[in-house]
């Protein structure tokens, strides 16, 4: 006998007498909640960068063109740059003799290379608008590079938006034409490449490219040297403590400095070094944004300069041992052990570095090192804001404080940079802002990496 139900398809749905098809229920109409959800997504979800960042770049491109067309160009240093270029074009190679309306040439040869191009583009001083166009493009390209860094670091759009809000920064680029903007371009590229190396565990050639970009930044203006401790530590970690590869990166940096300055090295090497890398150069007190709370006599005193340098080194060392260096290396014994391994195995890689250092830690090393240098800078002029403004969205995100406080901090910081002329109130507030943010990043920012048990284990270089 065939059992009842044997012919029924297994798993076929059946509807009993008491079962009815479910009635379709429309989702609730909650437009305000939907708007709030969309706002929260666009502000706080890093995935929304794919939407927000292209829009912000487009808006900035439009804004920069509007500023260029509606706000008058302000002559500060561009004429002096051109006068210096004309002296070089007329055959002068002694850096100590190259001068412009605002004083002697005090920037390395990368600056000369770039402004030779601008002399051709703008026909000297005849077509300043052509130079402004290039600086407008430079601003947008630099912003794109910086947004790429933000994306790799998962910085939410709510913080990334701080990168485009500075009135002073817009002026520095398209209305002033300062060389600081090109240093920022190459420094941003260097940071981007280093972050990529850490995120995707890429070594070798790409690290060399990052080192090259860094050297290019230094060859335009010395402020990039504020990154130097962080760059050296980054190379050390990315190259897995391989002594040979580290030296190779350093050699690439030096080679670029030599190549770009060949016309001046050949005839007046000492004059070039003394002028292009003059660490004792005095700054003008009246343009110092950060030290108006002290007297001019103090500002110019070498003892004040030395105290700033000592303070810079002390804070840097504290960060190195508590936040930057991997935890199993930040003791004398750990440093001695890894140093010995470097000497005994100069062509091999320490395993722990590549396994433990991530993109966020590399960015922390680079950005915080620069920010410490800014805090203790002997002088900050208005154009120097470009040195570190682009890092503020990342630092504010790392500070891990309520967003309204970040907004208040940023508005206060921006007021300091737009207060004209420089004054004691703005200088004091600027130091309060930068010190508080650095402290927050120290206490609440990303932790330093922890190396594994095999901290000095080496493997053959790939």
Swiss-Prot record:
- Note the Pfam families from the entry: ALG3
Enzyme category, top tier: transferase
Please list where the region (Disordered) is annotated: 1-21
Instruction: Please state the protein's primary subcellular location.
Output: endoplasmic reticulum
Regions that span the bilayer: 145-165, 177-197, 218-238, 244-264, 307-327, 357-377, 391-411
Q: Which domain of life is it from?
A: Eukaryota
Q: Keywords for this entry?
A: Endoplasmic reticulum, Glycosyltransferase, Membrane, Transferase, Transmembrane, Transmembrane helix
In the record, biological process GO terms are: protein glycosylation
User: Membrane side Cytoplasmic: which residues?
Assistant: 166-176, 239-243, 328-356, 412-462
Residues in a coiled coil are: none
| Residues in the Lumenal compartment per record | 1-144, 198-217, 265-306, 378-390
Tell me where in or outside the cell this protein is found. Answer: Endoplasmic reticulum membrane
One annotated Gene Ontology cellular component of this protein: endoplasmic reticulum membrane
* Pathway annotation: Protein modification; protein glycosylation
How is this protein positioned relative to the membrane? Multi-pass membrane protein
| GO molecular function term, any single one | dol-P-Man:Man(5)GlcNAc(2)-PP-Dol alpha-1,3-mannosyltransferase activity
Could you tell me what reaction this enzyme catalyses?
Answer: an alpha-D-Man-(1->2)-alpha-D-Man-(1->2)-alpha-D-Man-(1->3)-[alpha-D-Man-(1->6)]-beta-D-Man-(1->4)-beta-D-GlcNAc-(1->4)-alpha-D-GlcNAc-diphospho-di-trans,poly-cis-dolichol + a di-trans,poly-cis-dolichyl beta-D-mannosyl phosphate = an alpha-D-Man-(1->2)-alpha-D-Man-(1->2)-alpha-D-Man-(1->3)-[alpha-D-Man-(1->3)-alpha-D-Man-(1->6)]-beta-D-Man-(1->4)-beta-D-GlcNAc-(1->4)-alpha-D-GlcNAc-diphospho-di-trans,poly-cis-dolichol + a di-trans,poly-cis-dolichyl phosphate + H(+)
Q: What is its EC number?
A: 2.4.1.258
Give the protein's biological function: Dol-P-Man:Man(5)GlcNAc(2)-PP-Dol alpha-1,3-mannosyltransferase that operates in the biosynthetic pathway of dolichol-linked oligosaccharides, the glycan precursors employed in protein asparagine (N)-glycosylation. The assembly of dolichol-linked oligosaccharides begins on the cytosolic side of the endoplasmic reticulum membrane and finishes in its lumen. The sequential addition of sugars to dolichol pyrophosphate produces dolichol-linked oligosaccharides containing fourteen sugars, including two GlcNAcs, nine mannoses and three glucoses.
Q: Which PANTHER family match?
A: DOL-P-MAN:MAN(5)GLCNAC(2)-PP-DOL ALPHA-1,3-MANNOSYLTRANSFERASE (PTHR12646:SF0), NOT56 - RELATED (PTHR12646)
Family classification: Belongs to the glycosyltransferase ALG3 family.
- The protein depicted here goes by the name Dol-P-Man:Man(5)GlcNAc(2)-PP-Dol alpha-1,3-mannosyltransferase
User: What lineage does UniProt assign to this protein's organism?
Assistant: Eukaryota, Fungi, Dikarya, Ascomycota, Saccharomycotina
